Amino acid sequence: MSFEEKHKKGYELLHEQDLDMSLDMARELQKLNPEAAEGFTLEGEIMQKLDQWEMSIKSFDKAIAIEPENGRLYNLRGYSYLNLENVKESEADLNRSIDLSDLPTAHRNLVLFKLMNGDGPGAINYLIGRIKADPRDVENWILMGDLMKKGGHDEKARTYYEQALKMDPENEYARKQIED
């Protein structure tokens, strides 16, 4: 199996929740090419699934050392820092990710960062700005629905979920939220 095939297989295994086999693939990738970020990135994502946040950060550190301009890596590491409540590191990585790649997931993680740090109004305002900037991003509508629902605004939440369903009629999560 080639490097690319092992990389693809590693992510397939990760999505199937076969974390042991996926980790084996990550380690094989690292041995095949220790100068490539892919093996370390896959390992970091596996560690996130296992809630091994410190280990994931170590893996992402290695990947970032190889690819320092990869915004996705900063987003992944920022999310791990967020789960450890390492505020400064998380915010810096999420902002770096946005600066490098403007990833929608990094913006959503920044919303979570604001929420976890007690800035609910800032999180909502930021998310409203994201919805205005990219109204076709279904996940932003769903996240806003979740925030409204959590805040006890069920009717407002419903409108956000309905908007998400207009754009993605197959979205089971949004459908389930409306049915509940």
Descriptions of predicted regions:
Residues 1, 143, 150-180:
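Terminal, low-structured helical/coil segments at or just beyond the last alpha-helical repeat
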Residues 2-38, 42-51:
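Alpha-helical segment of the N-proximal tetratricopeptide repeat
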Residues 3-4, 37-38, 71-72, 104-105, ...:
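Helix-start (N-cap) detector for alpha-helical repeat units in TPR-like alpha-solenoids
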Residues 16-24, 50-62, 83-96, 117-129, ...:
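Structural signature of tandem alpha-helical TPR/SEL1-like repeats
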Residues 34, 68, 101-102, 135, ...:
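Short coil turns that delineate tetratricopeptide repeat
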